[in-house]
Design a protein with these regions (language model features):
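A detector of single, family-specific signature residues
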Residues: 1-400
Length: 400
């Protein structure tokens, strides 16, 4: 019975090996994440000729090389949630923290939780690829929001009010009418330099070219706004056209990347057996289906629906003391924030498209009728949605 505690950091780790009752097999020592050092570590563990369990704390991506190598060598490896390890570490009165101390604490955790520890299970290449794509999608969405904010700021100076007339990027059809329009008509002075009839004709030609609705009424509204508005920066300012067109170009490049990633996610997700089941659930469309699967991963790794709900961090923790029993508890938020976000988008989509036959929709409506806020009702609906998701997908895999 030997516990190997590994405190992982970027590019290197500190290893401590213990037996029960604090018997030290090997004092803490450092290794780098290279084939040579990891090979020497695995050879050392094989020579111990005893049952070995390796424990490490989840550290984003830094622990993955060590985890992958040791699992390929056949070792039992448990990856512990950082919050659990923090709680265990806080049991000590002394608050000293070094890599050597941390590795010893992790090794002690392995001894104390020897029979409760679970071996880390990989989710499969498809789920891992979807997860990576989902992470990159969120990254580029942040860039999209930043780029959109910069363009909006410039438009407030050159074309105030235009953002209320033209829609921005649509995640479903991946078209951005506002950016397309500003790329062609980058300042109100460009519009007012023409007569209303000339601008209307130009707008109709532009709309047909970009495959938008060629509405004369819309053109007249835009022209009237251009005449009435007061741009802060005149078009004669030498840098204005360059700044506006560059802001549009950057935004479009980010949006194109988002479109490529989402297309790849849809392509991969459609190869999974559960895709059709997830796609048929209320509120889930072609965009949200791959996102949900990417965030949840292989649902078979959860022991029941409650575990999936806890993974999302929307489980209200019980609280009671003496005669008091807490009823109106808030969600824990100790889980995947990205899954909560995608799940909330799903509930919004479900509520917008009334589906009285859907059990989750009826549940959300019921909670709202009981006096719950719309947000609380949607979170309650998400709780029910994830339980149904778990039941349907696991049932599917049982029958395969």
């Amino acid at each position: 019975m030997i516990s190997v505690g590994i405190d992982v950091s970027k590019g290197k780790s500190t290893v401590c090996i213990l037996k029960p009752y604090g018997e030290i097999v090997s004092k803490p020592f450092n290794i780098t994440h290279t084939q040579k050092d990891l090979s020497e570590l695995s050879s050392m563990l094989f020579r111990l000729n005893d049952e070995v369990k390796i424990v490490m704390e989840a550290t984003g991506i830094y622990h993955l090389p060590v985890l992958t190598y040791l699992q390929e060598k056949g070792f039992f490896v448990s990856v512990v949630n950082p919050y659990l390890m923090k709680s265990y570490r806080n049991e000590s009165l002394r608050k000293a923290k070094t890599d050597k101390i941390d590795s010893r604490i992790i090794a002690n955790y392995g001894i104390d939780h020897w029979f409760k520890m679970k071996e880390f299970q990989t989710s499969g290449e498809i789920y891992e690829e979807l997860k990576l794509l989902g992470q990159q999608y969120r990254h580029y969405m942040k860039l999209h929001l930043l780029s959109l904010a910069e363009l909006t700021h410039l438009l407030d100076l050159t074309m105030p009010g235009i953002k209320n007339l033209l829609a921005s990027w649509n995640e479903t059809n991946r078209k951005d009418k506002r950016s397309d329009f500003v790329e062609r008509f980058w300042h109100y002075d460009v519009i007012t330099s023409m007569s209303e009839q000339e601008f209307t004709e130009e707008y109709i030609l532009w709309a047909k070219e970009k495959k938008y609705v060629p509405s004369q009424e819309k053109a007249k509204v835009i022209y009237a706004l251009a005449q009435e508005s007061i741009p802060t920066l005149p078009s004669e300012t030498s840098s204005i056209k360059m700044l506006v067109t560059e802001a549009v170009r950057v935004l479009k490049e980010v949006d194109a990347t988002l479109g490529l990633i989402l297309s790849r996610m849809q392509e991969i997700a459609k190869t999974l057996p559960e895709y059709s089941v997830v796609r048929e659930m209320g509120g889930v469309g072609n965009t949200l289906a791959p996102k949900l699967i990417a965030e949840i991963g292989d649902v078979r790794r959860f022991r029941n629906g409650k575990a999936l709900v806890a993974f999302a961090g929307i489980d209200p923790p019980p609280y009671e003391s003496g005669q008091f029993v807490g009823c109106n508890r808030k969600i824990s938020k100790r889980g995947s924030a990205s899954l909560r976000k995608v799940g909330y988008e799903t509930m919004r989509s479900l509520k917008m498209r009334s589906r009285p036959e859907d059990p989750v929709y009826r549940y959300v409506v019921k909670k709202e009728s009981e006096g719950k806020s719309k947000k609380s009702a949607k979170i309650a609906g998400l709780n029910k949605f994830l339980r149904i998701y778990y039941a349907r997908v696991t049932e599917l895999y049982k029958n395969i």
